[in-house]
């Protein structure tokens, strides 16, 4: 045994050998192992008469001997093994070469290939007819936004939809929702990737890895998208699925000698049969024995690898034709490879045709998501991998469950063919087997609970149970496999294309996935009752009854109808297939721009019926995923949309829902609207009722509120975890169905939409609990679970548990959204399931949640219940200022919620580290009608926060409210809620940023929101449902306050520091109203529409034009944000959108005509239009006051728009973003001009606008901020004034906090900021925010697109790749000139607020960094000018 002292002595001996005397002395004195030596050490450092060796050998000798030994061990053994292997390999290769070299062999091979192909086709037809087991799976990788990070494998739950009319082809429909961590964009793009375009192509791809001909088959099945996908796909998930298939096949082959023999025969036939020459026969004689043994056994590779494609195909065909291999083919779904070929062929030939039930776009289908086209290329390749991997698993499952596969009806296919031409290649057509007409397998990454994607909306209850049984089994295997993969993929709540299940059995279930060119255009139109696909332009209002949600927003929205049927089978029970009708309007901005009218809102509202899929949501939960920006805009439209959600939910719930769970309970009251913002922040929305009472939960829930915690979809294990919980839950009774409106969006406008949607729903008579969530786009992995307690529509001020009469029913009524973190999720989901009925389950996996279930309040209209739930993973991250009563943070623990006493506790943001028990009065400031603003769990909203969601709960009245332990904070929402404002945290820089409220209502400081877009959007979401066009118009002060972020003002008053209060005004819902309010408001509203953000209107009406423009800009930026995430990362894009929104709003405020022009431009997203609008702004006499600012804004917007537009052109929805940016820039410019003369550079303008936002908003706060946004306009105004001054410094801090990299970015930009700082300090915060956002966006865009360290380079490349129109160049030149002109003014501003400017520049860079179609070069030019 070697002791430490032995080592020390050896070292000492070495030192003495080297005569290192001083080192020896030091070593002896310091070494604890030589203490005894120290007593006898001489001055020279030597120990006399001491043998410093081990076994007579010193250190050098020992080491030399050791090295010699090791070299002997390692060197001798390798050559023998390697040489033998190499010899065998050489031998087999030489044989193959000689064989292939013979011309006769080649000729015969071709003939064999032709005949074999023909034979294979015949056999496939027969097999498909005889074996419906080969399920059609279409791989639809879902690319979320950009792939800022190599997307975790998009979870693909591929469930055989049923065979296509061509029985021979089995397609796997795999919807991959991959999302980058930060670029989680909801349903940004759906890629339909052929499993294998051609057998040969697959063979070539797979040949290197083929082990057997069966494995070849498998491989071929995977290979088509496989090769491209592998780059992006999570290697583990893909490997797992592929390995499963290969292992199964391998086991079968190894266990069956006859199969091995036949395989060898088939191989030898082709290797030998063509060799008629003497040499060839000799070789062939060897081949059967040697090649097979040498290659297959030693190398584990089939000899075919070295054969030509034709030879491989021949062998494969021969094998397939052999009935003995039928089981193997079933394993791999041998038809899959054929189907893949057919799919690619049929898709290419008939993208819209019905015969391929699926229309596959090119593997580059990602082009579908136009706004993220740059990302599309990355995402596409990544997605196909998902498809392939899922295909493998699915084929196995499908084959195993062959009885489940039904032949898809031609009708369905035909219906699919209806998909719009623009979507043709991008359209995902899935015909469900007639039996399962409504059954669809969708991987809905954003909704972990929906993760099973055994979402078969069986239009018929009959079909549902039956299909549920059939598919449950398949799903059990498939889901498990797919879930394994799904959990890897990060997907926003973009639902994969899922088939809509026509309510009528007659109508084949057609899932329409329209992928618009625009980033937000990706439309998943799943029409349930109406099999027809609604055109993107068609508005929901027009077709309220039709499931195809808002077609107008379809471009911007992904419409997803996922039907999970109650778990009839054990697997299905796991999945608890919930019929989920999810219309996800990813591009909230696009939606806003598209649906400036209520139609937008309608389209935004997505009906989602979630029946304990993933969650043990025992009952159907109709979740409308949508930004529902304008949901309240038009009562009729809203009613239509509500009706759609409501009616479709009911009809589909009842019809599509498993017969077990009729959706009768899913009535308007019961419908749950889950609005997932354009950002994929809420990638996964898992509705997990307590497992114990899954059915009961849903049942009691519908009338009552549901508490759901929503986590990001990123937690990969969550899917699997969710599944088990769903397994626990039993079928969901129709009575168990709970209807909630869950709005998950990073965009502030979405939050406004929630209010609008609630108002609309109330108008429609659809009192649905509304949950407004900000999706955690920035740190999807960190995404805190958003816990939402939804009070029932009619229960006013009643907590969810209070609403539920029975404790058991309450437990049942609780829907817990699992947080995406898989590990925490699982435990908490189970725990959440265990939640007692008395407690609204606040399930926080990563962090505390704030579950605020506001009581219905008149402010919100009929849909009174608004729940804002926030999950803060790292409460400590919150600043101490957040610790004020304003912010309530529910500390989250990995431990089950039931076990934890913490969930009941409300912990103020970590800074204060104070914990409020839910029972205790959280804050004297909280009033029953309190507004709760939840910042998104994006990247640290506050500097100290990491992926936490600051939640500020502000009560207008200041009444204390206590929440019973374990209950979510029950915040009765009154008008103050509508006036959502995040109280300014005592730490203005951080908490304010976290709030994302930059005095938003009056001070369009939504740059913060941009940074925190997801969180801000939550704040914005803070139930502006009440705000309706009419309400906004009539009660500018009041409802604008309410709908816009007035509450911050009022709420802020109760808050500790009014100056810190930043009001988040999301006027998207109020855009029309704002127009009515006044020209400025009209402009703002128009801009809002353009930006697809209605919030600006509210902002403008609430505050004077100067203040309003910044708010509008911020809002618009937030609105733009959803498109940007598609382009970049969600959060980044959200930021840029917010900035652009603000700019746009300010521009809009400049003049109504300009607004109209800008809105038009936004719609067109043409730089020329933007230039025209800018010119008009300059020309318009109305702009005389703000002309300079407007011009600056116009220039900025032009430049931004130009950059954005180029980006937009690349990414379908960019155009909206560009317009938004330009408008926001204009707004900021207007503000700037108020303070100073017009500046020309867009970047300068943007910076100035940002500064303007901060300073102008402050000024406006002092003057306009008191605007009636908040019901208590007077107090709000005073508070606003305070916040203006205070916000100046904090805003930059907030911005830095808001942007994940804001802090870092600020210092680099400081030199640039002075030159481009706005004329007044008012814009300093905005400028900082803009700069920070821009930098973040650029960096994230670069990361997501190319994962390279040079985001600008990547963006530049992308921009260059996209054709730059000469008009854009001209516009850029004009903008540059203008920017130069504005330089002096910006410099003046910089003198006043350089620090703010730095931050602003950073933010500015982020939002303007290629928000959508922005040219990198142009963008850089503008930045340089600003610098």
From Swiss-Prot:
Effect annotated for changing residue 27 to A: Impairs activation of histone gene transcription
Bias kind Low complexity: ranges: 654-665
Effect of residue 1350 to A: Impairs activation of histone gene transcription
Principal subcellular localisation of the protein: nucleus
Impact when changing residue 779 to A: Impairs activation of histone gene transcription
Subcellular locations according to the entry: Nucleus; Nucleus, Cajal body
Tissue expression: Ubiquitously expressed.
Keyword Lyase: no
Record-listed Phosphoserine modification sites: 207, 554, 599, 775, 779, 1100, 1151, 1200, 1254
Family under the similarity heading: Belongs to the NPAT family.
Oligomeric and partner information: Interacts with the cylin/CDK complexes CCNE1/CDK2 and CCNA1/CDK2. Interacts with BZW1, CASP8AP2, CREBBP, MIZF and YY1. Interacts with the RUVBL1, RUVBL2 and TRRAP subunits of the NuA4 complex. May also interact with GAPDH, NME1, NME2 and STIP1.
Domains (record comment): The LisH domain is required for the activation of histone gene transcription.
Entry protein name: Protein NPAT
Native organism: Homo sapiens
Organism phylogeny: Eukaryota, Metazoa, Chordata, Craniata, Vertebrata
């Amino acid at each position: 045994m070697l002791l430490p002292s032995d080592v020390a002595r050896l070292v000492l001996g070495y030192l003495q050998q080297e005569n290192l005397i001083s080192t020896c002395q030091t070593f002896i004195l310091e070494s604890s192992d030589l203490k005894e030596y120290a007593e006898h050490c001489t001055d020279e450092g030597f120990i006399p008469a001491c043998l410093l060796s081990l076994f007579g050998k010193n250190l050098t000798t020992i080491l030399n001997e050791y090295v010699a030994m090791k070299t002997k061990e390692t060197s001798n053994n390798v050559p023998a093994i390697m040489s033998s292997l190499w010899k065998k390999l050489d031998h087999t290769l030489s044989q193959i070469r000689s064989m292939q070299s013979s011309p006769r062999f080649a000729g015969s091979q071709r003939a064999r290939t032709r005949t074999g192909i023909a034979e294979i086709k015949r056999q496939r037809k027969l097999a498909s007819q005889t074996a419906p087991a080969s399920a059609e799976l279409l791989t639809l990788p879902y690319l979320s936004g950009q792939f800022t990070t190599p997307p975790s494998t998009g979870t693909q739950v591929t469930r055989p939809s049923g065979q296509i009319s061509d029985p021979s082809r089995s397609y796997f429909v795999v919807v991959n929702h991959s999302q980058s961590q930060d670029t989680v964009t909801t349903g940004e793009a759906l890629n339909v990737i052929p499993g294998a375009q051609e057998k040969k192509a697959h063979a070539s791809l797979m040949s290197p890895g083929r082990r057997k001909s069966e494995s070849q088959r498998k491989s071929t099945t995977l290979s088509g998208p496989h090769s491209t996908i592998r780059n992006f796909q999570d290697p583990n998930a893909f490997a797992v699925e592929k390995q499963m298939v290969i292992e199964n096949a391998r086991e079968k082959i190894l266990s069956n000698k006859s199969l091995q023999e036949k395989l060898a025969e088939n191989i030898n036939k082709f290797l030998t049969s063509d060799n008629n020459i003497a040499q060839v026969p000799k070789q062939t004689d060897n081949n059967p024995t040697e090649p097979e043994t040498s290659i297959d056994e030693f190398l584990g590779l089939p000899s075919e690898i070295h054969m030509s494609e034709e030879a491989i195909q021949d062998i494969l065909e021969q094998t397939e034709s052999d009935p003995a291999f039928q089981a193997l083919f079933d394993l791999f779904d041998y038809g899959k490879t054929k189907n893949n070929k057919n799919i690619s062929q049929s898709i290419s030939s008939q993208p819209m045709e019905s015969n391929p039930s699926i229309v596959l776009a090119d593997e580059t289908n990602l082009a579908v998501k136009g706004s993220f086209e740059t990302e599309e290329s990355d995402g596409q390749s990544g997605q196909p991998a998902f498809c392939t991997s899922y295909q493998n698993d699915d084929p196995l499952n499908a084959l195993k469950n062959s009885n489940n596969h039904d032949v898809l009806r031609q009708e369905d296919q035909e219906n699919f063919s209806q998909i719009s031409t623009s979507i043709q290649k991008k359209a995902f057509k899935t015909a469900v087997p007639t039996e399962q007409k409504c059954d669809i397998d969708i991987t809905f990454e954003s909704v972990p609970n929906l993760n099973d994607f055994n979402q078969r909306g069986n239009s018929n209850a009959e079909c549902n149970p039956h299909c549920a049984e059939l598919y449950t089994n398949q799903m059990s295997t498939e889901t498990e496999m797919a879930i394994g993969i799904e959990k890897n993929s990060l997907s926003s709540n973009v639902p994969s294309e899922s088939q809509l299940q026509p309510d009528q059995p007659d109508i084949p279930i057609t899932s329409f996935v329209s992928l618009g060119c625009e980033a937000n255009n990706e439309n998943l139109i799943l029409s349930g009752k109406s099999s027809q696909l609604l055109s993107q332009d068609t508005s929901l209002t027009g077709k309220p009854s039709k499931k195809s949600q808002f077609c107008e927003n379809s471009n911007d929205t992904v419409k997803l109808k996922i039907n999970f049927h109650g778990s009839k089978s054990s697997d299905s029970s796991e999945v608890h297939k919930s019929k989920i009708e999810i219309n996800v309007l990813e591009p909230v901005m696009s939606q806003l721009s598209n649906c400036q009218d209520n139609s937008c809102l309608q389209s935004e509202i997505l009906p989602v019926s979630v029946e304990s899929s993933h969650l043990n949501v025992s009952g159907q939960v109709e979740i409308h995923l949508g930004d529902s920006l304008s949901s309240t805009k038009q009562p009729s439209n809203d009613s239509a949309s509500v009706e759609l959600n409501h009616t479709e939910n009911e009809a589909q719930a009842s019809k599509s829902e498993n017969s077990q769970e009729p959706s009768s309970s899913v009535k308007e009251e019961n419908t749950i609207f889950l609005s997932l913002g354009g950002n994929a922040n809420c990638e996964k929305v898992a509705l997990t009722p307590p497992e114990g009472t899954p059915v009961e939960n849903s049942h009691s829930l519908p009338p009552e509120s549901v508490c759901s915690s929503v986590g990001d979809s990123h937690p990969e294990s969550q899917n699997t975890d969710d599944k088990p919980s769903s397994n626990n839950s039993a079928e969901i009774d129709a009575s168990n169905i709970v209807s909630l409106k869950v709005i998950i969006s990073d965009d502030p406008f979405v939050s406004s939409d929630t209010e609008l949607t609630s108002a609309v729903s109330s108008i429609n008579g659809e009192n649905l609990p509304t949950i407004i969530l900000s999706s955690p786009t920035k740190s999807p992995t960190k995404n805190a679970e958003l816990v939402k307690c939804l009070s029932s529509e009619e229960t006013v001020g009643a907590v969810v548990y209070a609403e539920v009469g029975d404790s058991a029913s309450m437990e049942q009524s609780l829907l817990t959204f699992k947080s995406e973190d898989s590990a925490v999720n699982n435990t908490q989901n189970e725990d959440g399931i265990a939640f007692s009925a008395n407690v609204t389950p606040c399930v926080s996996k990563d962090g505390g949640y704030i579950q605020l279930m506001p009581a219905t309040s008149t402010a919100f209209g009929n849909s009174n219940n608004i729940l804002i739930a926030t999950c803060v993973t790292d409460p400590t991250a919150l600043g101490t200022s957040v610790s004020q009563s304003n912010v309530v943070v529910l500390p989250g623990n990995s431990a089950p919620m039931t076990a934890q006493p913490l969930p009941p506790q409300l912990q103020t943001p970590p800074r204060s580290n104070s914990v409020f028990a839910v029972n205790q009065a959280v804050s004297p400031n909280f009033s029953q009608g309190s507004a709760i603003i939840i910042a998104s769990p994006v990247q640290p909203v506050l500097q100290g926060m990491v992926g936490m969601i600051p939640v500020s709960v502000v009560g207008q009245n200041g009444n204390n409210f206590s929440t019973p332990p374990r209950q979510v904070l029950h915040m009765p929402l009154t008008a103050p809620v509508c006036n959502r404002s995040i109280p300014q945290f005592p730490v203005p820089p951080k908490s304010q940023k976290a709030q994302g409220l930059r005095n938003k209502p009056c001070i369009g400081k939504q740059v913060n929101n941009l940074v925190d877009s997801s969180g801000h959007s939550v704040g914005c979401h803070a139930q502006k449902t009440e705000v309706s066009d009419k309400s906004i118009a009539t009660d500018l002060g009041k409802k604008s306050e309410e709908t816009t972020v007035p509450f911050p003002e009022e709420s802020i008053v109760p808050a500790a520091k009014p100056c810190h209060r930043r009001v988040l005004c999301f006027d998207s819902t109020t855009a029309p109203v704002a127009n009515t309010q006044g020209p400025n408001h009209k402009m703002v509203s128009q801009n809002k529409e353009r930006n697809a953000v209605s919030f600006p209107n509210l902002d403008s009406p609430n505050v004077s034009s100067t203040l309003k423009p910044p708010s509008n800009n911020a809002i618009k930026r937030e609105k733009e944000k959803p498109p940007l995430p598609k382009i970049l990362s969600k959060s980044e894009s959200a930021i840029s959108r917010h900035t652009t929104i603000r700019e746009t709003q300010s521009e809009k405020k400049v003049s109504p005509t300009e607004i109209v022009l800008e809105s038009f431009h936004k719609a067109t997203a043409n730089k020329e239009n933007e230039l025209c609008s800018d010119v008009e702004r300059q020309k318009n006499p109305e702009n005389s006051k703000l002309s300079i600012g407007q011009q600056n804004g116009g220039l900025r917007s032009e430049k931004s728009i130009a950059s954005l537009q180029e980006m937009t052109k690349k990414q379908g929805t960019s155009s909206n973003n560009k317009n938004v940016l330009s408008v926001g820039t204009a707004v900021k410019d207007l503000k700037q001009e108020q303070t100073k003369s017009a500046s020309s550079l867009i970047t300068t303008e943007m910076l100035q606008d940002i500064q303007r936002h901060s300073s102008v908003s402050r000024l406006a706060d002092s003057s306009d901020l008191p605007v009636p946004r908040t019901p208590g306009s007077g107090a709000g105004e005073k508070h606003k004034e305070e916040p203006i001054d205070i916000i100046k410094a904090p805003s930059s801090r907030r911005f830095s906090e808001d942007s994940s990299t804001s802090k870092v970015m600020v210092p680099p930009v400081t030199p640039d900021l002075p030159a481009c700082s706005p004329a007044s300090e008012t814009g300093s915060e905005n400028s900082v925010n803009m700069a920070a956002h821009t930098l973040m966006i650029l960096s994230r865009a670069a990361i997501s697109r190319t994962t390279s360290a040079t985001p600008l380079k990547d963006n530049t490349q992308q921009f260059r790749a996209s054709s730059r129109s000469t008009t854009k160049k001209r516009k850029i030149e004009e903008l540059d000139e203008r920017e130069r002109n504005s330089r002096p003014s910006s410099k003046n501003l910089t003198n006043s607020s350089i620090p703010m400017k730095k931050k602003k520049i950073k933010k500015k860079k982020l939002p303007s960094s290629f928000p959508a179609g922005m040219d990198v070069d142009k963008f850089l030019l503008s930045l340089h000018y600003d610098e």
